[in-house]
Design a protein with these regions (language model features):
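Membrane-embedded multi-pass helical conduit in multi-pass membrane proteins
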Residues: 228-287
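Short beta-strand/loop segment that forms part of the nucleotide-sugar
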Residues: 33-43, 64-65
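Short acidic donor-binding loop at the edge of a beta-strand
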Residues: 86-91
Length: 287
């Protein structure tokens, strides 16, 4: 019998999480195995209120309460580190708590993970449900990160894989910055599945221009070496073609600013302590 861990980061989103758990309970019906949910509570200010009475297909729900708010990407890092520490062989699935990751598509990811044990199965976002402005901003982010890194990163947290892959996932601390970038950097075998991104269950999207810029910076700093090489060759090529002193100086300054900024951001924000120490306490709310 297979064991499954469903990892969900959450911050003040308990109403949505209740609906997600209800849908997950339906979605995994008929799948042979034991399903356990780990919720990483990112230091929510609202009182935890989860309804677990009718979740017959979910055997256990555990909440990891964090000492401070650190963001969903770092919360996922801690959740995966916790699973790695308890050394429990399983299939791990990751979803956001807001409902944008369709729980009824989870079975599709799990089935692929069962067949391809050495692969990380990720959900490529084939369609997004945000307004036109946010879709446009996200498109610019995709183009910008592709231009700088050479990587097309069109997936988020929604994924599934065997726990044996955690060793290569944690080859370094790249996952601390951004889950998708860390996976793409550390794992060669990635299976992409096209899945439509759904609307949030409740409330407005938290994504805005500031969020996208911050997230893009976290992604590109993971590929700092690739950025250095690509930008160096691009600047060199332009200098050789145009041979304009003023343009050359501007390009060199831009090259230095870009690479120094990326490197500095990585060094300042890099993990230099045991992330599991950020767990305040653990609480079982369903056994």
């Amino acid at each position: 019998m297979n064991n499954f861990f469903i990892l969900i980061p959450s911050f003040n989103d308990w109403v949505s999480l209740n609906k997600l758990l209800f849908h997950l309970n339906k979605a995994v019906q008929g799948v042979e195995g034991k399903f356990k949910v780990i919720v990483v509570n990112d230091c929510s200010t609202e009182k935890i209120n989860l309804k677990t009475k009718n979740l017959k297909n979910i055997k256990n729900i555990k909440i990891l309460n964090l000492k401070k708010n650190i963001g969903s990407q770092k919360a996922i890092f801690i959740g995966l580190k916790y699973i790695q520490k308890i050394n429990y062989k399983s299939i791990i699935a990751i979803l956001d708590s807001d409902g944008e990751d369709n729980p009824f598509k989870l079975k599709k990811l799990i089935n692929l993970a069962l067949k391809k044990k050495k692969f990380i199965v990720v959900a490529d976002r084939s369609k997004r449900m945000e307004n036109i402005f946010l879709r446009f901003l996200n498109y610019l982010r995709l183009i910008g990160t592709f231009f700088l890194t050479g990587k097309y990163i069109n997936f988020g947290n929604f994924s599934a894989f065997y726990s044996t892959n955690l060793k290569k996932i944690f080859l370094n601390n790249n996952l601390w910055f951004a889950y998708s970038a860390g996976i793409l950097k550390n794992c060669k075998k990635i299976e992409r599945v096209s899945i439509e991104k759904k609307k949030r269950y409740y409330g407005a999207s938290k994504v805005n221009l500031t969020f996208l810029l911050s997230h893009s910076l976290k992604i590109i700093c993971v590929f700092k070496k690739e950025i250095f090489v690509r930008s160096f060759f691009a600047v060199t090529l332009i200098i050789l073609i145009f041979k304009n002193l003023v343009l050359d100086i501007k390009l060199i300054v831009l090259f230095l600013i870009l690479n120094i900024s990326v490197y500095a951001y990585y060094q300042i924000n890099n993990l230099n302590f045991d992330a599991l120490k950020l767990i305040k306490n653990k609480k079982n709310i369903k056994n």
